[in-house]
C-alpha cells in the first residue's frame, strides 16, 4: 500500500531542450496528463526536500516515452541545465482514484516475488524497480544470487498481484530466470 503522506516519483528530468528553458522528462507514470496539463508540480534534487513549481505547458515527443515541458521561471537553456537529474513528484494523497482490482505500478516496488513450484509457493526475490520505456517490466532481484532479472508485466507471466499481502506471483517462461 502507498503511504498517503509520501511522494511518488512520476518523472525524471533527463536534459534540456532548446534555448527557451524547456526540459526533457522521462515518464515513470501511466498518466500522461501529469506532463501535459498546466498546474503545480513538485521538483526534487537528490537529497533535498521537494519544492513547488508550476508546469506551464508540455507535449509528448512523437514515437517516444518522453515529454518536453516548460516550467515557470525556467527561461533559458542554462536554467534548464540546472534541473538535469531532478525528479518530478506528486503527493500520494493526490493520486488518481482506481477501481477495486487496479493499483498504481509504483505500488509493486518492494513486493515479494513468488513462483508456484510443485503446488507450493516459493519466494524467489523482490521487485526492486520498474522499467517502462515501451512495455512495463518488473526489475526483480533474485535472493539466491542477487541477480537482477527483467520480467514483462503481462497477465500471462504475472498472473497475480496481491498488494494487500505484499507479493506477486510470476509464471516465467523456461530459462527466463537463468538469463
UniProtKB/Swiss-Prot annotation:
Keywords: Chaperone, Cytoplasm, Ribosome biogenesis, rRNA processing. Residues 100-176 form the PRC barrel domain. It is found in: Cytoplasm. Its main location: cytoplasm. One of its GO terms (biological process) is rRNA processing. InterPro entries: PRC_barrel-like_sf (IPR011033), PRC_RimM (IPR056792), RimM (IPR011961), RimM_N (IPR002676), RimM_N_sf (IPR036976), Transl_B-barrel_sf (IPR009000). GO terms for cellular component: cytoplasm; ribosome. Belongs to the RimM family. An accessory protein needed during the final step in the assembly of 30S ribosomal subunit, possibly for assembly of the head region. Essential for efficient processing of 16S rRNA. May be needed both before and after RbfA during the maturation of 16S rRNA. It has affinity for free ribosomal 30S subunits but not for 70S ribosomes. This is Ribosome maturation factor RimM. The lineage of its organism: Bacteria, Bacillati, Cyanobacteriota, Cyanophyceae, Synechococcales.
